[in-house]
Amino acid sequence: MGAVSGELTAPSRANPIVFQESLLASSSEQSATLPRHVAIIMDGNGRWARRRLLPRIEGHRQGAKSVRRAIEFCGDTGIKILTLYAFSTENWQRPKSEVSGLMRLLSEFIDSELEELHENDVKLSTIGDLERIPAAMAAKIKAAKSRTADNKSLILNIALSYGGRQDIVRAVKGLATALKSGTVDEDSVTEELFGRYLYTAGLPDPDLLIRTGGELRISNFLLWQAAYTELYFTPVLWPDFSKEDFLRAIEEYRSRQRRFGMTSEQVETDEGVE
C-alpha cells in the first residue's frame, strides 16, 4: 500500500508550463479519480532549518508557506478535505520555547490567512484535544472556526494536540458512557457507530495520506481512519514541498487500484457495473 516517490509521470519543476497543463487536467478530465480527502504528515521542518544553520522555528515558519501552497493546490484541483498534522500529543514533550514558537506561528497564520480562507470558501476545522491549547490560542481558533463555519469548497482540518491512540481511547470512553447510560444498545455497536465518537466524526476517511521528509511511518496519526488509506512517502522536506510534489503524489494515487480487501477481479467487476 505504501510507496516511496520515484519516477512518476508528474511534470518537472523546471517546466512550469507542463505542470500547469497537468494541473488543469487533474481538476477536470481526471476528476473522477481525484482523492476526496488528503491527509498530510508535514515532516522535515527541523532538518530543513538545521541544514541551513537556522533556528528550528525558521523551518516551521517556512513550512507555513507550504501549508498555503497545499491549500491553493486543493482549491485548484477540487480536493474537498485537507487534514494537516500540525501538532501531536507527543509534541508537548518538545522544549517549551519550540512549543511556544509553534503556537505563535499558528496565531500568525490565522491572523494573516483567515480572511482569504473565508473569501475562498474554505472552512477551518480542527481535531484533537484543544483543552491543552493555551486559552487565548484556543479562543482564536474557536473564533476562526465560527467565522468559516458555513464555507463549503474546502475543509481545512488541522490536527492540533492530536494522537491516533488518544483519539481511539477517547472514543471508547464516549461509547462506554453511552452504553452504560442506555442511550446506545450493545447490539447496535458497529464500526460506523464507533466512528461517530472519533474526532473526525462526520468526515470521510482519508483516501490518501502523504508523509514528507523521508520517514516511513505514520506516527500515531489517524490510526483508525487510515485503515484503507493509500500511503505516499516522499523524501522532500515539508518546507520544500511544492505544488509539483503534491501533483506527483496525486498521480501516484491515481495509478493504484484501491481494493478494500477485495481481489483485483472483484474491483474491476464492480467498476464495470458502475
Where is each model-derived feature located?
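Flexible, compositionally biased loop and terminal segments
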Residues: 2-274
